[in-house]
């Protein structure tokens, strides 16, 4: 039990710091598109897709590794709450196109990145 808590703690800490750094470095570049949030969500989606495929192929690995990557790292890195707040701020300021683009890029992009990583890791581990 302690090792699982430690895995979540370590992964979450690394993911949260990475998300914060992405926001610091990229959110100010385009005021109508918070790139740091988008990058955090796309990278997290790619990582979790690859991790799911990898752990399906390696079920013998300690589950704490899966928890560290999926729940910890990806949970700390990706950010639905920040994304939601940004969309609401766009809507409240009348920036409907920016809100719509932000929703489209985050949702469609995250689904695409998860599927892409899953397919890539599956292909790499079977060839």
Curated annotation (Swiss-Prot):
Localization in the cell: Cell inner membrane
UniProtKB keywords: Cell inner membrane, Cell membrane, Ion channel, Ion transport, Membrane, Metal-binding, Sodium, Transmembrane, Transmembrane helix, Transport
Reaction catalyzed: fluoride(in) = fluoride(out)
InterPro entries, per database record: FluC (IPR003691)
Annotated signal peptide: none
Chain residues that bind Na(+): 75, 78
Activity regulation, free text: Na(+) is not transported, but it plays an essential structural role and its presence is essential for fluoride channel function.
GO molecular function: fluoride channel activity; metal ion binding
Annotated TM spans: 4-24, 35-55, 71-91, 103-123
Keyword Chaperone: no
Membrane topology (UniProt): Multi-pass membrane protein
One cellular component term from this protein's GO annotations in UniProt: plasma membrane
GO biological process terms on file: cellular detoxification of fluoride
Presence of keyword Transport: yes
Family affiliation: Belongs to the fluoride channel Fluc/FEX (TC 1.A.43) family.
Task of the protein: Fluoride-specific ion channel. Important for reducing fluoride concentration in the cell, thus reducing its toxicity.
PANTHER family: FLUORIDE EXPORT PROTEIN 1-RELATED
HAMAP family (alphabetical): FluC
Name of the protein in its database record: Fluoride-specific ion channel FluC
């Amino acid at each position: 039990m302690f090792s699982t808590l430690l895995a979540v703690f370590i992964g979450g800490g690394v993911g949260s710091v990475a998300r914060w750094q992405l926001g610091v470095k990229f959110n100010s570049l385009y005021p109508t598109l918070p790139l740091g949030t988008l990058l955090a969500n796309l990278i997290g989606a790619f990582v979790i897709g690859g991790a799911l495929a990898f752990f399906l192929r390696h079920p013998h690995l300690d589950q704490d590794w899966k928890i560290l990557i999926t729940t910890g790292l990806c949970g700390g890195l990706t950010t639905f709450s920040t994304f939601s707040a940004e969309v609401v701020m766009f809507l409240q300021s009348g920036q409907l196109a920016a809100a719509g683009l932000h929703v489209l890029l985050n949702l469609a992009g995250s689904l695409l990145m998860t599927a892409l990583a899953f397919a890539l890791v599956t292909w790499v581990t079977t060839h």
